[in-house]
Amino acid sequence: KYPYIAGMGVYIFKKEILLNLLRWRFPTANDFGSEIIPAAAREINVKAYLFNDYWEDIGTIKSFFEANLALAEQPSKFSFYDASKPMYTSRRNLPPSMISGSKITDSIISHGCFLDKCRVEHSVVGIRSRIGSNVHLKDTVMLGADFYETDAERGDQLAEGKVPIGIGENTSIQNCIIDMN
């Protein structure tokens, strides 16, 4: 089906072998896939696992962006809801997102977000994101936030001339990756 087999960057080593490879055999190597694994395969017993399910190479900013946006397309190459292939992730114990007066199409909205009178098209919105009124996101990957700011903290930030977390009112963003916080 595919003309090549790619390394996914997932490796399992015995601790002693890994330390030996890194400390003594390849102390100046920078990359497992192109340096350490090929050289180690000539010297030690290396096995591969052929993975036939969904996988995307996200080794460049462009491929990271495109792979994230592809998750919002229907039908998507990857299903978050396939009971035969459950997805396990870290528990975050976040509340559901609060969406008020907004229009969202072909997008993924994560947990704990606040969206107020905004428009989100073909975008991925990460955890704890805050999107203000009259905001238009299109073809955007918004990675979210590590923590919440209270309304008082947001007010203090603005009073000090600083920028609070999230997308402020009357903003239009297209074809963009917005980093966390």
UniProtKB/Swiss-Prot annotation:
GO terms for biological process: glycogen biosynthetic process; starch biosynthetic process. It comes from the Eukaryota. Its EC number is 2.7.7.27. GO terms for molecular function: ATP binding; glucose-1-phosphate adenylyltransferase activity. The keyword Cell inner membrane does not apply. This protein plays a role in synthesis of starch. It catalyzes the synthesis of the activated glycosyl donor, ADP-glucose from Glc-1-P and ATP. This is Glucose-1-phosphate adenylyltransferase large subunit 2.
